[in-house]
Amino acid sequence: MLILMAAACGKNEDDDIIWDIANFKIEIQVVNGQGQNVTSQVASMAPKAVWNGKTYELNANRKQVNVAARTRALMAVFEGLFTDEGRLYFGELSGSDTYQDATLVIQWGDGTSNEIKFNHELVWKDNEPIFNQSFWLDGKRVNKIVITKK
């Protein structure tokens, strides 16, 4: 039995690691001309998100998730376009999926819209997950999505 225990502690012990890949949501800051957060006023504009040919109204897909009913797996809970903690979000999307030039259009209900493009890719380096993400707002590369509404 001592020999078996020693054999189980070899160099390949990382082979049995099971990774839980976190899901993600796209965070959209909505500010006024002075840079103040106005997300709380967004609902009155009745914004919609257009994604993969489908239209999602604000908060129409919000789900009350029963934590006890969830599995141990990190399944993406897609809620469409929603507000939470003073921010506007779209998602959740699976962190293990690849998105290349994915396009999300926010229609603001006042005749204006913004186009968000993004890339999301999970790559493995030295047996560790690395996430590569990039975002564009109306054709301009950005580090975070900040939309000014007056």
Residue locations for each model-derived region?
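Tryptophan-paired
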Residues: 41, 45-105
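Short, solvent-exposed beta-strand/turn "edge" segments of beta-rich domains on protein surfaces
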Residues: 15-21, 38, 93-95
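Beta-strand-rich extracellular modules
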Residues: 31, 107-111
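Short amphipathic, basic-aromatic surface patches that mediate peripheral association
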Residues: 30-40
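Surface-exposed molecular-recognition determinants
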Residues: 27-30, 59
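A general secondary-structure signal for short beta-strands and their flanking turns/coil
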Residues: 21-23, 101, 142
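Bacterial Sec-dependent N-terminal signal peptides
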Residues: 2-27
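Glycine-rich, aromatic-bearing surface loops/beta-hairpins
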Residues: 112-150
